[in-house]
């Protein structure tokens, strides 16, 4: 699935991932391929991309590899929203 992460200043990530874990208002939730369409608010926390590797170095510099979990890259947000539909998601955050 394709995920794009945008802040007011720049595009933090755009590419294919296996799944994404998000800090929802009611707790962390996981989006996988073929997930039902969703629009949700996000609270302060970490967006976790599950993917083999972040190939683009311009994007990779914004992420930390999570040592306890293979293929997991995190980006800290203060809040935002996600729209996911047809295996494509846009995360607007700050």
Task: Please state what every model-predicted region is.
Residues 2-94:
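Compact, glycine-rich, soluble single-domain proteins
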